[in-house]
Amino acid sequence: MAVSQLMQNLTKQLLHVRERKTDVMQEGETAKELNYEGEDMQATSSAQNRQTSV
């Protein structure tokens, strides 16, 4: 019972975070946020490159 309640709470929080992220994207992103996304994508692609080269 307690576990299912915890899972429900986590699911609600996750959905709220997703909604908030969508709101922020709809409001328009600042250059700083776009820069962070670019760095994340670069880090992801370098990690993928390392995996394929091994």
Curated annotation (Swiss-Prot):
Bias (Polar residues) ranges: 42-54
Chain residue ranges for the region called Disordered: 23-54
Domain of life: Bacteria
UniProt biased composition (Basic and acidic residues): 23-35
Protein's name according to its UniProt entry: Uncharacterized protein YxzL
Biological source species: Bacillus subtilis (strain 168)
